[in-house]
């Protein structure tokens, strides 16, 4: 997960990067509870104002294909449900019998493979760039790789 940090306050929080799953609410900070959303585009101004609690690790291409609302109207929230997309259901993996749960492996943040992954995102060496871009690491493009693996017998 992309994480923000305020070292002086000793606080950390998950960021509104593409694929983040967060809890929606009304104006009252304590009004959330039943509606969730998936961040489609980096919405960093929402950091620390709405709670991110998960991320999409598979199928984001389907989420990105959803119809979008006009940002000038209700901040892009589609007001006519029949014009939007409908999610017919979801499965909470923890509720599945253990032998039916998908198994995912994420890269550990220690060691050379992680350091190389981070370097490759920061240092752009592709022949595409006829002008070398600055060495920067965009936190929202820096997701830890995850892959689905066969369940252990």
State the predicted function of each range.
Residues 1-153:
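Cross-family detector of peptidyl-prolyl cis-trans isomerase
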């Amino acid at each position: 997960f992309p994480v923000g940090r305020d070292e002086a306050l000793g606080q950390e929080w998950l960021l509104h990067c593409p694929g983040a799953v967060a809890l929606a609410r009304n104006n009252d900070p304590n009004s959330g509870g039943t509606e969730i959303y998936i961040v489609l585009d980096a919405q960093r101004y929402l950091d620390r104002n709405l709670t991110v609690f998960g991320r999409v690790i598979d199928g984001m291409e389907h989420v990105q294909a959803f119809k979008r609302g006009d940002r000038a109207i209700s901040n892009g929230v589609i007001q006519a449900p029949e014009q939007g997309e409908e999610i017919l259901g979801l499965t909470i993996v923890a509720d599945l019998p253990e032998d039916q749960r998908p198994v995912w492996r994420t890269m550990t943040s220690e060691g050379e493979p992680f350091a190389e992954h981070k370097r490759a995102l920061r240092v752009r060496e592709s022949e595409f760039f006829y002008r070398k871009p600055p060495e920067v690491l965009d936190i929202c493009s820096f997701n830890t790789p995850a892959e689905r693996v066969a369940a252990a017998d």
